[in-house]
């Protein structure tokens, strides 16, 4: 469904990504994890063409992603980014309806099917009560939910999510991840919360310093040894009473340092 082969990217000053390869099969939920600055967001930006790789290729549904027009890509791939400021005073519903633009002609109006889909997604994301409210007045978490709703209304077979649970309360984090999972679409998401990644992702790619350091199922990847190597923390990994993988981090004690 979505794959990258040998993606490398850098600026004049430094190399940021080194020959990154990954694959997400149809209906698979794939997570990209790693510490801050490891290249997760940069990799996604190369996949949705905000940045152009120096080397490598990407494919979506068997076709060259980097050669697709913006409209072709938008009909197959929806993206949710971390930045969500808007200089225009649109209502929540208007922002969500923008997800249908890739399916429309230049002057084509929304039809009953479009309106029904928008209504359904507003309900699923619990945004009905603020649908007429200005997007600019929302909290960071509410804005994030609006952008996720817009991506769902785009109705593409594949989703790219860059830190989708940022700014969200734990309730909405869990609701969002569960909603994305049950939709059955192909998902590639950069995720900071390792317990959420363990709970919802079928496969993980671990990045460090612009390279893929490990990949596999959560059980294969989220080990105390790898967490120590990648994140420089001590952790225990176990299963809870429901059989779900859980990570328990140990406190970091700065022994021998002066008190502040």
Predicted regions and their residues:
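Conserved ABC transporter NBD signature motif
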Residues: 56-64, 73
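Catalytic Walker B motif of ABC-type/P-loop ATPase nucleotide-binding domains
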Residues: 159-163
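Conserved ABC ATPase "signature" region
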Residues: 97, 112-130
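The feature captures the beta-strand-to-loop junction immediately N-terminal to the Walker
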Residues: 33-35
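Helix-to-loop junction immediately C-terminal to a conserved catalytic motif
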Residues: 48
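Conserved ABC ATPase signature
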Residues: 109, 134-138, 142
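ABC ATPase nucleotide-binding domains
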Residues: 229-260
């Amino acid at each position: 469904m979505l794959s990258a082969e040998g993606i490398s990217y850098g600026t004049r000053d430094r190399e940021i990504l080194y020959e990154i390869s990954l694959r997400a099969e149809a209906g698979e939920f794939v997570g990209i994890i790693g510490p801050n600055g490891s290249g997760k967001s940069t990799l996604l930006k190369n996949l949705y063409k905000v940045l152009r790789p120096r080397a490598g290729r990407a494919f979506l549904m068997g076709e060259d992603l980097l050669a697709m027009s913006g409209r072709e890509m938008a009909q197959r791939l929806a993206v949710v980014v971390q930045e969500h400021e808007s200089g225009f005073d649109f209502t929540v519903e208007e922002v969500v309806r923008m997800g249908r633009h890739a399916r429309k002609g230049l002057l084509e109006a929304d039809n009953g099917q479009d309106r029904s889909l928008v209504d359904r997604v507003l309900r699923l994301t619990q945004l009905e009560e603020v649908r007429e409210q200005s997007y600019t007045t929302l909290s960071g978490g509410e804005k994030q939910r609006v952008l996720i709703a817009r991506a769902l209304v785009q109705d593409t077979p594949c989703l790219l999510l860059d830190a989708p649970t940022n700014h969200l309360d734990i309730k909405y984090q869990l609701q969002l991840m569960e909603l994305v999972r049950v939709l059955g679409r192909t998902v590639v998401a950069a995720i900071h919360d390792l317990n959420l990644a363990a709970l919802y992702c079928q496969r993980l790619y671990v990045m460090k310093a612009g390279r893929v350091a490990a990949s596999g199922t959560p059980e294969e990847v989220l080990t105390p040894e790898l967490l120590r190597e990648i994140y420089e923390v001590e952790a225990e990994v176990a299963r809870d009473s429901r059989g779900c993988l859980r990570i328990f981090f140990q406190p970091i004690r700065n022994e021998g340092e002066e008190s502040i």
